[in-house]
């Protein structure tokens, strides 16, 4: 038997809670070997056990299993009925079996495959041999890693037509053997919802990580070399793109250089050294003009606002940190060196301090261009880096940050002009072929001093502009200044002697600026503090920057002409400058120099307020733009172009708070944003003239000129103090010049940069507010007459509207002095209360007489209440209490009226009351409708009266409770039973009553009638006493009905027999035990009548006996006379027979039912 045993899993249900595993094991062990018992208890939400069952693994034979189930199934055990079944197989057990079966199947298949290979003579795909061993007997089959046998393949190369031989044994070292056991179960706890994946873009997108959007990369256009080439720096065309190809040709360097010079704003704001990495590229000015022409269009197409925003943000971070020592080796890729290739460390660090990294491509002409470690191989790289770092430590970071800010400001102005002049210079250079590294550096210097304003912001643009500056443009610019013609030898001498200029160059990034600064110093040194510095050499970077700043302030007049010429060039963000031919450029430069001279003279006598007002005009970008086609091109943009110009002017004159909403908004972000946006806004059509553009710009700025005057007066910048030197001949030219001077002065006050930025933001907000208020004023004036209500009492709340008085005041302020006062006023308006209404204005406009007039709503007692209520709200005009809030006559006032009755009225009322009392006593009538007016008035209901429980007078409104406790049902039932009890009648009483029945009946009749008339409340009260007072009368009435009919009118007893219905007893009150005459049986009425006549003559003893017999209760008693006629409704003679037949039938039915039940039981028994 044991051999046939199988392991079965049984389900045992219906267990009680106190059954243990041991109990189950003992119970089932007699049928087989119990290997495992598992008891499971299901509980409800409260933890109470609901169902208990068990699984038992038992090794048992089939016969024993049947026996076990037949014996134990449906049996009761410890309070539960067992239910035994074969349980479903455990899924773990089934899984193990499936795996074993799969494993066995797999083994069979492998053996089958091996046999098949042997039969067919195929290759054994698993051989133990060194990878690369050829399979004997099979050509081009080799053993690879893990003993796999793979064929040698001949594959076509993807990029070439050549077919290569692929030996798998030589490319198999990255193969991994994958384990066969895939059944490693991962616990649920280690599962995750995260999608694992690499860093490829699809995996990142699946995880929800999206990279920042980057515009398409700059296109680099190849330009053919020109015969003459000067060093041009290849700048990274975009902030995030680093040029990583050292073997770039000179052409490519030049074209990169030109790309950046055209779009200087892109690279300029990026302080990160990576963006400015310049590889070892030789300096060349290869076909610059053609490169510019191409790039001006192509680069502009790929430019995006996102890039601009990125660059602006980076430049802002740079301004905040102003840490020049960060990545010095990379951040200053260019070093200015002398002929002996010794680095001018001070220059490097002036660059570093300004945060101008590789952007300063324009190096001092005095010093040779000292290339960065990566850019220049002739210098010792380690030495250069060391020198840079040492100087960085020496310099004062604070000074540099200030200078950086100031130079950034000026850079915007010079960008446009420098760009144009740069372009011309490039053309000139190509003709002259006299470009060398030194001369290139000097020209960059010359250009820098006018573009000194563009130094920090245009640092990168300067580096881009460093490519080439032509002598012709330089001569044209210097025509109006103290003219100094410099040869290369002179420039070399200057590089050795005057180190200040190189520093200026490095700062300003405009190559032309530095030479011009020198000339400016020579010519106008008496004006400016630069004269102080000129005498000695500036070695330390801080000194260099300071001297540069001072020189720039005083020489602003000279610089501005250049700046005006240069600005179009910088401004040509979209390559506008490249659209024109060389000849037109040169002519325009000459004319612009002449007009610049006029600007200088006019500036000396110009009034600062006029200048500040005019700064908003478009000429900030280039006052001489009339002659310059580049400027015309810029101005052709129309109103769009006004914004950049305004931006620059406002930035230059920091006093001004608002030029136009658009410009001020853009300005508030960062100075860099202005030139960038200005460049972006340039259109490529270049035929519009300055006159038309001036009109537009002046129109746009007219709104804010007055406010600009005020702010320029209050700003207190040194530039404004110096500006009175300028004359107001040409307002447009003055604007640019004055903006330069302001930017120079802003260098002096660089520490207040953040405060000024905030002021600019406020100015932008003010401009917007002003525009809104102008609209509001128009709407207000248009709608002023539509409001019919008087001004002193508005019927509706006006949200956020300003009254006419306020608008008039603001308009007068705007006209007279719209400065800080206007700002404060507008701020006050914007921060006003939510419910500002014209009440505020009317309160100011009210006369004192109206203000102190006695208001009728505050008179009297109700007025006093209203006054107290008003005092809670204070002077808040939103909660003014007027006559609408007065209460109507209150209860107290009514009482006062009652108190004011005259004595005569009171006496009259008393007399009336007495007369009424007399009438009531005589007639015994309760007159409830008294004519007392006071009581009527007091009882009259008024909606306005509010019940106040604290007031004694209000007690009249309270409903008084009945003092009598409500009787419970039990008490009422008890009373009813007591009333039903038959009273004990004494013979004396009966005797007395029998003597005078008529009197008794009369009294009962009277009382019954009276009781009928009395209300229910009184009736209840009189119920008990009457019972007690006259029990004999009641019983006698019950006993001898006396023949009178129950009615409200006197009825004689004579009518007894005529009346069909009569009442035996008179109801005294509502006596419960009295029977209802209607319930009496009609069949017994005649008997009663006869009985009555007999009873009247009977003796008292008989009467008592009869009374006991005839007392009737509501329920029937045995032998009740009322049931005598019921026999008629019963079955007659055959009733006994029917009963017997019914009983016989029922017994038969019972017998049949029992028989069927027994038969069914017998059938159900198992055979």
Swiss-Prot record:
One of its GO terms (cellular component) is nucleolus. The modification Phosphothreonine is found at residues 302, 381, 795, 888. The keyword rRNA processing applies. Expressed in various diffuse-type gastric cancers. Detected at lower levels in skeletal muscle. The modification Phosphotyrosine is found at residue 376. Residues 248-275, 640-652, 738-748 have a biased composition (Polar residues). GO terms for molecular function: RNA binding. It is found in: Nucleus, Nucleolus. Residues 501-510, 653-668, 727-736, 749-776, 817-827, 874-887, 940-968, 1007-1026 have a biased composition (Basic and acidic residues). It holds the Pfam family RRM_1. This is Nucleolar protein 8. Residues 753-779, 886-924 form a coiled coil. There is a cross-link at residues 225, 314, 1057 (Glycyl lysine isopeptide (Lys-Gly) (interchain with G-Cter in SUMO2)). Interacts with the GTP form of RRAGA, RRAGC and RRAGD. Interacts with NIP7. Interacts with DDX18; the interaction is RNA-dependent. Interacts with DDX47; the interaction is RNA-dependent. Its main location: nucleus. InterPro entries: NOP8_RRM, Nucleotide-bd_a/b_plait_sf, RBD_domain_sf, RRM_dom. Phosphorylated. Residues 223-304, 435-470, 499-533, 590-908, 932-982, 1006-1026, 1071-1105, 1145-1167 are annotated as: Disordered. CDD domains: RRM_NOL8.
